[in-house]
Amino acid sequence: MELIFLGTSAGVPTRTRNVTAILLNLQHPTQSGLWLFDCGEGTQHQLLHTAFNPGKLDKIFISHLHGDHLFGLPGLLCSRSMSGIIQPLTIYGPHGIREFVETALRISGSWTDYPLEIVEIGAGEIFDDGLRKVTAYPMEHPLECYGYRIEEHDKPGALNAQALKAAGVPPGPLFQELKAGKTIMLDDGRQINGADYLAVPVPGKALAIFGDTGPCDAALELAKGVDVMVHEATLDMAMEAKANSRGHSSTRQAAALAREAGVGKLIITHVSSRYDDKGCQHLLRECRSIFPATELANDFAVFSI
């Protein structure tokens, strides 16, 4: 998987940062797909500056209904339809997301020529497609807001083909059954258990993408042990009280959570427009003083998971 940041500014766009949108490229060998997390104003234009086709977009997750995370959605939905894309799309978001989308389309005389499903969520598991699952956690923000934990299921270990050949198992369809952990019977009556010829399963990757939030009870469970944690760092340490009063977090709080949760990497985003490039580096230094494995997301930055 890889993350592509399409927008990294808090509240309003700046000359160098658009408002929030994060693309997740699943990079699965047999199931291509793109997921979008939040869709601030101008997201579809940001997408044009990448190599990714909106037709590959099959899921959109909205954290909350503040405009800097939402106002790009109607335009993206309509442009996707006008481009002749017919692949289905599912939107997940808090209560009110259905009314917002349906009202925007109705009042503007717009529609989609592809199947569009809108799922209003609460806290808990959203879905499990057999390859990965997504769970929503409640954030601390003035509006109903969620963070998302994306977990790949463990992958089966490699099949020991040499040992199977030595045991007299012919290569072919039987290998596929054994790789699935099944038990087969050979012509000579012997039973071969696939589990005996599989290496240790390969652990799946885990990712936490926080919505806007101040410190909250669910944060640790959402982030615990993930490979990558994406978290806002709207303001610096000196402005922590102001950040919290508005349902946001400081650099110190994001980094301290990453350390406590034992994450592999912290990526900070949702930077206040008060910070220029020099100020953003100040935010990064504050985080790294607490959690060294921190990166600052800029628009169009790409991170592997």
Swiss-Prot record:
EC numbers: 3.1.-.-
Superkingdom classification of source: Bacteria
Pfam families listed in its UniProt record: Lactamase_B_2
Signal peptide: none
Annotated residues for binding of Zn(2+) 2: 68-69, 212, 270
Gene3D superfamilies: Ribonuclease Z/Hydroxyacylglutathione hydrolase-like
CC cofactor note: Binds 2 Zn(2+) ions.
Positions that bind Zn(2+) 1: 64, 66, 141, 212
Subunit structure: Homodimer.
HAMAP family linked: RNase_Z_BN (MF_01818)
Matches recorded under NCBIfam families: PRK00055.1-1 (NF000800), PRK00055.1-3 (NF000801), RNase_Z (TIGR02651), true_RNase_BN (TIGR02649)
Protein name, as recorded: Ribonuclease BN
Source organism: Escherichia coli O1:K1 / APEC
Gene (UniProt): rbn
